[in-house]
């Protein structure tokens, strides 16, 4: 019995260490975030979209790290950051994402999205969601696939961008306060 308790204590200590490391890594800003924000701001200006704020989703980061950033281009700073789930399809794991634009793949798609209207989910009419429209070849089927931004539990989805409930509510309120045509850029 003592042997098993010792093993359980060791495993618990290792898991606590992993969680602590993930928390520290989660709070570190990606080194290229300002460059990516500048690229997104230039994209928005060139295509006539909102040049005040944008959303960057860095799926190159592990799902235990904050990887969704609402960025204020005028102040050149992050105004909100969050954990974000990705699609469970393909070779995706709970830590890393695989990408596809194919219907039924259950993968996330990289590229630029125009953030649309607030609505409820297709398969859960009581759950709020935000529509997104893919603007690139890599995500052109987003509307047909039913890809949304919505609250979710855990790091995996059917291809949607999922956020913890409290962060989803903050992002939703923030988006409603901004002019239309906000762009979200998912990259790895």
Region locations from a protein language model:
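Cell wall/extracellular polymer interaction/catalysis modules
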Residues: 21-158, 165-188
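N-terminal Sec-pathway targeting helices
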Residues: 1-16
């Amino acid at each position: 019995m003592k042997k098993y308790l010792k093993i359980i204590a060791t495993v618990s200590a290792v898991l606590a260490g992993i969680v602590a490391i993930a928390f520290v890594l989660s709070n570190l800003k990606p080194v290229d975030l300002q460059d990516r924000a500048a690229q997104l701001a230039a994209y928005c200006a060139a295509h006539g979209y909102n040049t005040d704020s944008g959303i960057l989703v860095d799926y190159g980061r592990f799902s235990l790290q904050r990887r969704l950033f609402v960025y204020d281009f005028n102040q050149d700073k992050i105004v909100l950051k969050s954990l974000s789930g990705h699609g469970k399809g393909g070779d995706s794991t709970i830590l890393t994402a695989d990408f596809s634009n194919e219907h039924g793949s259950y993968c996330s798609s990289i590229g630029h999205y125009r953030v649309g209207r607030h609505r409820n989910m297709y398969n859960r009419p009581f759950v709020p969601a935000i529509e997104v429209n893919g603007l690139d070849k890599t995500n052109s089927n987003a509307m047909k696939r039913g890809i949304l931004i919505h609250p979710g539990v855990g790091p995996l989805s059917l291809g949607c961008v999922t956020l913890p409930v409290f962060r989803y509510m903050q992002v939703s309120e923030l988006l409603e306060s901004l002019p239309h045509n906000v762009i979200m850029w998912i990259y790895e």
